[in-house]
UniProtKB/Swiss-Prot annotation:
One Pfam entry name: ASC
A Gene Ontology molecular function term of the record: pH-gated monoatomic ion channel activity
Extracellular topological segments: 60-767
TM regions (residue ranges): 39-59, 768-788
Gene this protein is translated from: asic-1
Keyword Kinase carried by entry: no
Family stated for the protein in its record: Belongs to the amiloride-sensitive sodium channel (TC 1.A.6) family.
GO BP term, pick one: positive regulation of dopamine secretion
GO cellular component, one term: postsynaptic membrane
Motif GAS motif, residue numbers: 767-769
Coiled-coil ranges from the UniProt annotation: none
Protein name: Degenerin-like protein asic-1
Membrane topology qualifier: Multi-pass membrane protein
Length: 823
């Protein structure tokens, strides 16, 4: 087949497609002539360009991968979530102080508080030359039957002092107290009747010595006072019998069961501050008459002392101290505040005798030459008698074995209490420029604690809580549980669905770095469901927080609570709620079940846990992922991790007393929070997640006195009420409604939408249907056949065209009849 034949064949293919296609415009352009053909061609090209633009918009929308969030309220059976509760106080104060690392952290915090208080300016009141003597209540220590005022005494006593010294807040070093006796040995009496008035002057007496407390009292209505010589008479205002006795024989006491005339029954309890509901009366031989108000007692505030001051104040004269020493074979050890140039000898620490009276430090010996023993007796100066049979003695003492001289020290609180914690460091009293190993260690530890330059109490307490976390992290698992609360002490009562639950078996305990022992309800129970909504059918707990065991670093009393899925790790420090003591804290919860689409529509992950996820036993969530990423970064950058998170793989967390690693942790945490992209973290949302929204409300608890459960035996009902409000809390966690909100993501524009819109645009602008697409396919197939046939010698059979043959026959007949269509 030649070129002309190929050309003719292709022309026939095009003509055949143009004549028979169902698409709009193409047949019209072919059969038309002149300007009509150009008009139809222009119209076809315009429609083709419009279709191309619409097709581009359709494809662009399809590639955006838009999603639709369907919201539906479903009424189905709901699983009750896991509820984790923790005490706001992480560890018991008494147990925590027995461990060295925690004790050091607490004492450093207390010392920082002492220093911050020392910077507060206070004006000292001038003392009057003619001050009056008044009684004052304070603490005393007993020595051979004599009582002496002492800030850290253990005997409650009453002393005599000057009036301006007894003001609250005056804690001068030159305060004078004398005539001190046990408080129970003093009596409260009537001194005299105020001149020209119906008022009484009271005083305190020990044997024959009485001191006016400058308190004026008045009898209640309708009682009236009168004086009959040396006697004091009491009678109603109306005419009635008078009761008269010597004024000195009336005593101020507590009373009860008072009638409307003011006559009462004397109470056996002589402490005027213990009984809240008792009255105050003046009594004589069982005849009591009520007076207004309660007797106010003067009390001296115990001053806060620095740690080394507390040790120094225990003994009057002699005690053992650590000091910098210059030790030689010829002269032995000599205490020095300025080190000798021979650093090998002067940069050592030894133990010395320190005389508080003349501030002399001598003699001194190396620490191995001292021995902790038991002595038979010690005097008030602090020196003790050396005993050859220490096992039979009871007083703890520290002895210099070369000279057999001993001083009294505190006994060890636990087996791991070191001598370093019970002996004063002389550089705490008079800082030195030397840098002995002990001093260096102490300075590094103080630097790591981060209290330097911080004066605000809130900032100090926040730093102290962080130091506690670091200190506790160094303990073993057994030691952590030893100082933590247990389930039976913390959770007093529990009910779920209106039925009592088993505290021992239904709660799972774990150690949280911030809140210590926490207890989770719901993990063991699996499919735990509610029968009804409302507080009565949810989880109800009565907890006992034990405020008396709170650490000084704890700011608030109460419970920390978080609601989460049963397979997730709870994070009470960031995702929790606080419930105070003395209230019923109600937490109404609602469930949102979320189903997200993965890529390319969304950015969720079906299984996000990797080998770097530090909460290995829990399900994946974004909070755990972020903490894992930060912990990984800290472990690789600083060589250790943050103890607020579990360790990363085989690495360990940073120690509390290393200032350089603590500083590294601090700096890298700032980097992690400000620019997390540098860490390479990719924490995506899980594709399936249950989210619990919580609403909070509270009311006073208990409402009235009456329930004595949980209170010490023998406690009165009104005291039990106050006891529970101070030490306990009621927690309620419940579903507000037994339905949940389902949020389901679905693709907004899929393949079906693409094909539908694409076909619609083709039909609108081009009149194209599926048949037209088939015609185009057939056209290209015919062209392909024509090209193949051109290489063969066999001639391709001619195709018949209805419209072409009709037009040719019409032209022939018209020419035959004499018509010329072209003219």
């Amino acid at each position: 087949m030649g070129k002309n034949s190929l050309k003719r064949a292709l022309e026939l293919d095009v003509v055949d497609f143009a004549e028979h296609t169902s698409a709009h415009g193409i047949p019209r352009a072919y059969v038309s002539t002149g300007w009509r053909r150009y008009m139809w061609l222009l119209c076809f090209l315009f429609c083709l360009s419009c279709f191309g633009h619409q097709a581009y918009l359709i494809v662009e929308r399809f590639n955006r991968n838009d999603i639709i969030v369907g919201v539906e309220i479903k009424f189905e059976e709901i699983k009750f979530p896991a509820v984790t509760i923790c005490n706001m106080n992480p560890y018991k104060n008494s147990a925590a102080r027995e461990l060295g690392a925690i004790r050091n952290a607490i004492e450093a915090f207390e010392l920082a508080i002492d220093k911050s208080d020392g910077n507060a300016h206070s004006k000292r009141k001038k003392r009057s030359a003619n001050s009056k003597m008044v009684p004052i209540d304070l603490l005393c220590k007993e020595e051979h039957g004599m009582f002496t005022a002492h800030d850290y005494g253990h005997v409650e006593c009453t002393c005599v002092t000057f009036e301006d010294m007894s003001k609250v807040g005056d804690t001068d070093d030159d305060e004078i107290f004398w005539n001190c006796h046990q408080r129970k040995d003093w009596t409260h009496k009537i001194c005299h009747l105020a001149e020209g008035s119906n008022q009484l002057k009271t005083c305190k007496c020990f044997e024959d010595t009485c001191v006016s407390d400058e308190v004026t009292k008045q009898l209640v209505w309708p009682l009236q006072l009168s004086k009959n010589g040396t006697k004091l008479c009491i009678s109603p205002e109306s005419s009635g019998p008078r009761y008269c006795a010597s004024a000195q024989k009336f005593q101020v006491s507590t009373c009860s069961n008072c009638d409307w005339l003011g006559k009462c029954e004397e109470s056996d309890d002589m402490d005027l501050e213990e009984e809240i509901d008792s009255k105050t009366c003046i009594c004589h031989h069982g005849n009591c008459f009520q007076i207004k108000g309660n007797v106010k007692k003067r009390k001296r505030r115990t001053p806060e002392r620095k740690v080394h001051e507390r040790l120094l104040s225990r003994y009057e004269g002699l005690l053992a101290v650590y000091s910098h020493c210059n030790c030689t074979k010829q002269h032995g050890c000599v205490s020095t505040s300025v080190p000798d140039m021979d650093l090998e000898n002067s940069n050592k620490t030894c133990l010395c005798f320190y005389n508080k009276k003349n501030e002399q430090i001598w003699p001194c010996y190396k620490e191995p030459e001292w021995e902790e023993r038991k002595c038979s007796r010690c005097n008030t100066m602090g020196d003790c008698v050396y005993s050859d049979k220490p096992k039979k003695q009871t007083i703890s003492c520290l002895c210099a074995t070369p000279i057999k001289m001993c001083v009294r020290i505190d006994p060890p609180q636990t087996n791991d209490t070191s001598l370093d914690d019970r002996v004063v460091k002389f550089w705490d009293i008079q800082p030195s420029t030397t840098m002995s190993p002990i001093v260096k260690k102490k300075e590094e530890r103080d630097k790591a604690y981060g209290y330097t330059g911080v004066k605000d109490r809130i900032a100090l307490r926040a730093k102290a809580m962080e130091n506690m976390i670091f200190a506790v992290d160094a303990l073993t698992e057994e030691e952590k549980w030893k100082i933590s609360y247990n389930k039976s002490d913390f959770i007093m009562k529990c009910s779920f669905n209106g039925r009592e639950c088993n505290v021992k078996h239904d709660f799972v305990e774990y150690l949280d770095p911030t809140y210590g022992a926490c207890f989770t309800y719901g993990q063991k129970l699996g499919n735990n469901t509610n029968e009804r909504s409302g507080p009565a059918y949810g989880l109800r707990l009565e907890v006992f927080v034990n405020v008396t065991e709170y650490l000084p670093t704890t700011e608030a009393a109460g419970v920390r609570l978080t609601v989460h899925a049963t397979d997730e790790q709870p994070f009470p420090d960031t995702l929790g709620f606080s419930a105070p003591t003395g209230f019923v804290s109600s937490f109404g919860i609602k469930l949102k079940s979320m189903v997200r689409l993965p890529a390319p529509y969304g950015d969720c992950v079906r299984e996000g846990k990797t080998e770097d996820f530090i909460y290995t036993q829990k399900a994946y969530n974004t909070e755990g992922c972020q903490r894992s990423c930060i912990q990984k970064h800290l472990s690789k950058t600083c060589g250790c991790g943050d103890p607020r998170f579990p360790p990363y793989r085989e690495s360990k967390n940073c120690p509390v007393d290393d200032p350089y690693k603590r500083e590294c942790i601090k700096n890298e945490m700032h980097v992690a929070t400000r620019d997390s992209k540098k860490l390479g973290c990719s924490c995506k949302q899980p594709c399936n997640q249950d989210v619990y929204s919580v609403s909070y409300s509270a009311s006073r608890w208990p409402a009235i006195a009456g329930d004595l459960s949980g209170c010490p035996l023998g406690m009165a009902a009104h005291h039990c009420l106050n006891y529970k409000r101070e030490q306990g809390s009621m927690i309620e966690v419940y579903f507000e409604q037994l339905n949940y909100e389902s949020l389901l993501e679905s693709e907004a524009y899929g393949w079906s939408n693409l094909l539908s819109d694409f076909g619609g645009q083709l039909g609108l602008w081009m009149g194209v249907s599926v048949i037209t697409i088939g015609e185009v396919a057939c056209f290209f197939f015919e062209v392909f056949i024509s090209l193949i046939s051109s290489n063969r010698t066999k001639r391709r059979p001619a195709r018949k065209s209805f419209s072409s043959s009709l037009r040719c026959s019409t032209d022939y007949n018209l020419n035959k009849d004499g018509f010329n269509l072209d003219n």
